[in-house]
Amino acid sequence: ISSGGSLQGILESHDGAMWIDVPAGQPPRSAVGHIFGTQINLCWSLGLLPRMEEKELDGMLARMEKLRDRLDLVGGDGSMMGIARELHGQRLQIMSAPALEAMGYRCRTQLNENSGILATASILPELHHNEIVAWGEGDMQDNVQILLFVWNGMHDRVGLRVEWTLDTLQNIPIHILDCAGDS
């Protein structure tokens, strides 16, 4: 999967290789919709994943469009810009439920790369097993803000840990990012 260039040339010169085109001119991080959509459609077409029912797919796309419009930095409701302003110049800790670990990790890497700040990430309950001790040490709570990824499908025990975390770290600004969807 590429937008052409050298990779396309290499693949076209080999029998059995397949090249799948996506629009050119975008860095991978801004082309994620094209890339992911192409990958999922390929998996459906090859029978590697069961195809979503049309109603389910329409619901997912409608949710994504609504969120895109609400969270847009220019025309949205301002919530993302508000969080960005609060996070500016702060140390960032990303916490996530186990099912959202990859999302927390990706958020950390994007913040590190694109904002030039050092963000760290942890998952619940591992956070409470090892890391929670450090939160009580010295100045660990100074100039730090937390991004907490949760969703309605979390295990009940993880939900209890989230509540405990909110109570224990109540002096630290925590931004709860409630992820939408059923999967």
Label each PLM-derived region with a short phrase.
Residues 1, 7-9, 101-105, 129, ...:
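Short glycine/serine/threonine-rich phosphate/pyrophosphate-binding segments
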Residues 44-143:
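Active-site phosphate/pyrophosphate-binding segments
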Residues 133-183:
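C-terminal active-site/capping subdomain that shapes the small-molecule cofactor and substrate pocket
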Residues 24, 38, 96-98, 150:
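Short, structured patches in soluble enzyme cores that scaffold and shape functional sites
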Residues 26-30, 127-129, 181-183:
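A short acidic, often aromatic-flanked loop/helix-cap motif at beta-alpha or helix-coil junctions
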Residues 18, 118-120, 173-175:
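Conserved beta-strand segments of alpha/beta enzyme cores
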Residues 1, 90-96, 146-152:
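Short glycine-rich or small-residue beta-strand-to-loop segments that form or flank ligand, phosphate
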Residues 1-69, 85, 164-167:
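Glycine-rich phosphate-binding loops that contact phosphosugars or nucleotide phosphates
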